[in-house]
Amino acid sequence: MNDLLRPALYGSTHNIIPSIKKFKYLNKNHEFVGPICESTDKFLNLKKFQTLNEKDLVIICDVGAYGMVLSSNYNLRTKPAEILVNKSLVKIISKRQKLNNII
């Protein structure tokens, strides 16, 4: 909700893909949620997704320019990095915010 407000605000959906592909999938419901304990901090429900372990990363696709503009430091959470991916080009647009930048 603080990182990506669009699903809570507009009901938008974004593709979610694993950062590292594994080939073991679970045929059960997966709910992707954010770190805030709010009922609207949900991104997507999927019926089939690969198995994930603690600290595995996923990519929320096609967030666009409004993703960071609508983000906040709600609950003293730092803002994520912005990464542009275009075919084989991967570029860090802004680095992950550090706590000492907001205190």
Feature map (PLM): residue ranges:
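Charged (often Lys/Glu-rich) extended helix/loop segments that serve as interaction or gating elements
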Residues: 1-103
